[in-house]
Amino acid sequence: MSEKSILLLNRTAPYGSHAARESLDIALTCGAFEFPVSLLFMDDGVFQLLGDHQPQSIGSKNLSASLAALAMYDVDQLFVCQASLAERGLSEADLALPATCVAAADIQSLIAKHTSVLSF
């Protein structure tokens, strides 16, 4: 772990708070400055990776554009907790973005590979 890196731990639903938007803003900023960043989606955070969000009905901006921009900024280290998907009746096929499924038992080692962790 000689190189500094950040893991953004996304645990909240995509709408209802600013947490998801703030996490994506940090990821895009890190990408713009070529700072190593990874995102882990777990708990209700897995809903951020689903397509066809329609937040206009609740007066929120759609996160889909920001999620799609991750690839343009070379932010491609996306992980999703397999257990969180299963608990919500979802599978990897439901995700709008490619993400590596991680077993709950392997999350601690994923966290340990990063020098900083920010939880949202």
Specify the residue positions occupied by each region the protein language model found:
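An anion/phosphate-binding loop that grips the pyrophosphate of nucleotide cofactors and donors
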Residues: 114
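Short, well-ordered beta-strand core segments
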Residues: 78, 117-118
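Short acidic-hydrophobic, aromatic-tinged amphipathic segments that line or gate anion-handling sites
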Residues: 98-105
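A glycine-rich helix N-cap at a beta->alpha junction
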Residues: 56-82
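Histidine-anchored nucleotide/phosphate-binding helix
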Residues: 20-39
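Short, glycine-rich nucleotide/cofactor-binding loops
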Residues: 7-21, 53-54
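Residues at the starts of beta-strands that form the adenosine-phosphate
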Residues: 5, 36-38, 77
